[in-house]
Swiss-Prot record:
Binding site for [4Fe-4S] cluster: C322, C325, C368, E375
Protein name (database record): 4-hydroxy-3-methylbut-2-en-1-yl diphosphate synthase (flavodoxin)
HAMAP family: IspG
Reactions this protein catalyses: (2E)-4-hydroxy-3-methylbut-2-enyl diphosphate + oxidized [flavodoxin] + H2O + 2 H(+) = 2-C-methyl-D-erythritol 2,4-cyclic diphosphate + reduced [flavodoxin]
Function description: Converts 2C-methyl-D-erythritol 2,4-cyclodiphosphate (ME-2,4cPP) into 1-hydroxy-2-methyl-2-(E)-butenyl 4-diphosphate.
Cofactor, free-text remark: Binds 1 [4Fe-4S] cluster.
Pfam families: GcpE
Gene name for this UniProt entry: ispG
Primary enzyme class: oxidoreductase
Entry GO MF terms: 4 iron, 4 sulfur cluster binding; 4-hydroxy-3-methylbut-2-en-1-yl diphosphate synthase activity (ferredoxin); 4-hydroxy-3-methylbut-2-enyl-diphosphate synthase activity (flavodoxin); iron ion binding
């Protein structure tokens, strides 16, 4: 006969308070300040995890690029990277910066350099000054002896103009000389590593080795951010775990070429979420392939939602909504959830300054009586719409208390007004007190 101690029932009882842990403490890294005018965005140190993005315009088109940068900044991107690949693009950078400043958009610009960055930074000093940060790829900065010289020229430009850099390694453009040497060394081992491990090590050595060379050239550790981007979830997690263990530089997270739609979102969320949960990562970029005609700002929203759903930051009020089931044959709750979520995001550019704290608000839009009232009570504001066969009434809860029951054809409009009034009443008062 099974003893009391061995019974399944008793094994579920905990005699002491269990430890329910959240995400791990944040990895300690050097704080890197990225500035433009009066705007300061700190990456690493005690700063919050930053969300950044990249334009897909032709940088030589100064007007088109400035417009997209503004859209990304308005969506919440704290840094925006632009391609600087030609003399025409480099010449346009000061005009882009000037147009943004004229529009009141002070988001720092990051110049993305490959192959010829040393020449562009030398020949276009106004471009070098207008950028707030440089991205350098050690894999294509030059070959052989030229690599060291051209890398040094870019670091010297960063020192001259007092700009931080991201040394960004990518397995699609990894330094082939380094990889070949490491493969040869691996072949000579008594017990060779797997090829995948050699690739990981090459990525890490390229990043850290380049960073240490930059330090030798005079660039401070507080001016360097590292990244090692790959396109596989488990590959990214493995590389960053080891990279974070072996250096104290601030780290930029991103799953390169994540893809389109739900696949890209899921892959990026899985990889970045795992690392953030372990306290690894100081800034993120979601590399989504936008569908034709879709706004570029989608990658910013996904990045924000990753951080907010993990409890790391708050950007906009969150809408909790049930998935629906056989009890919810009406689409009313789905339509209302979408309407409220869209409304909240549209209001945030104004609310962010007028109603500080509103970004932490939770709104529940539920579809039936099973979880509707309970979930609505947990939110700041909640509504429980009637399911199939239920009384055609929708109780509304504010701060856990039922305050009203809505009926009829204008439930959506009335609930939206209740939300708006709550924001003004609750967060407007907080703003006045501050």
């Amino acid at each position: 006969m099974q003893s009391e101690a061995q019974s399944p029932r008793s094994s579920q009882i905990c005699s002491t308070e269990p430890v329910f842990g959240g995400h791990a403490p944040r990895r300690v890294s050097h704080a890197v300040d990225v500035r433009w005018g009066g705007t300061l965005v700190t990456i690493g140190g005690a700063a919050p995890v930053r969300v950044q993005s990249m334009t897909n315009t032709d940088t030589a088109d100064a007007i088109g690029t400035a417009i997209q940068v503004k859209e990304l900044a308005n969506a919440g991107s704290e840094l925006v990277r632009i391609t600087v690949n030609t003399p025409e693009a480099a010449a346009a950078v000061p005009a882009i910066r000037e147009q943004l400043d004229r529009m009141g958009v002070t988001v720092p610009l990051v110049g993305d350099f490959h192959y010829n960055g040393h020449l562009l930074l030398r020949d276009y000093p106004d471009c070098a000054q207008a950028l707030s940060k440089y991205r350098i790829n050690p894999g294509n900065v030059g070959q052989g002896a030229k690599r060291d010289s051209q890398f040094a020229q870019m670091i010297e430009a960063a020192i001259k103009y007092d700009k931080p850099v991201r040394i960004g390694v990518n397995w699609g453009s990894l330094d082939q000389d380094l990889l070949a040497r490491m493969m040869d060394e691996n072949g000579a081992r008594a017990e060779p590593w797997e090829a995948q491990s050699v690739m990981y090590e090459a990525l890490i050595q390229s990043a850290i080795g380049s960073a240490e060379r930059a330090v030798e050239l005079g660039l401070g550790r507080d001016k360097i951010v590292l990244s090692c981007k790959v396109s596989g979830v488990q590959d990214l997690v493995a590389v960053y775990r080891e990279l974070s263990r072996r250096c104290g530089f601030a780290l930029h997270l991103g799953l390169t070429e994540a893809g389109m739609g739900s696949k890209g979102i899921v892959a990026s969320t899985a990889a970045i979420g795992l690392l953030l949960q372990e306290g690894i990562g100081d800034t993120i970029r979601i590399s989504l392939t936008p569908e034709p005609g879709a706004p570029r700002t989608g990658e910013v929203v996904v990045g924000q939602e990753i951080l907010q759903t993990m409890g790391l930051r708050s950007f906009a009020p969150m809408v909790v909504a049930c998935p629906g089931c056989g009890r919810t044959t009406s689409t009313l709750f789905q339509e209302l959830a979408l309407r409220i979520q869209t409304y909240l995001r549209e209001q945030m550019p104004v609310w962010r300054s007028e109603y500080p704290g509103v970004e932490k608000m939770n709104v529940a839009v539920m579809g039936c009586i099973v979880n509707g009232p309970g979930e609505s009570k947990h939110a700041n504001i909640g509504i429980s719409l009637p399911g199939s066969g239920e009384n055609p009434a929708a109780p509304v809860f504010v701060d856990g208390e039922k305050v009203k029951t809505l009926r009829g054809e204008h439930i959506a409009e009335e609930f939206q007004q209740i939300v708006s009034d709550y924001v003004a009443r609750t967060y407007g008062r907080a703003a006045a007190q501050n």
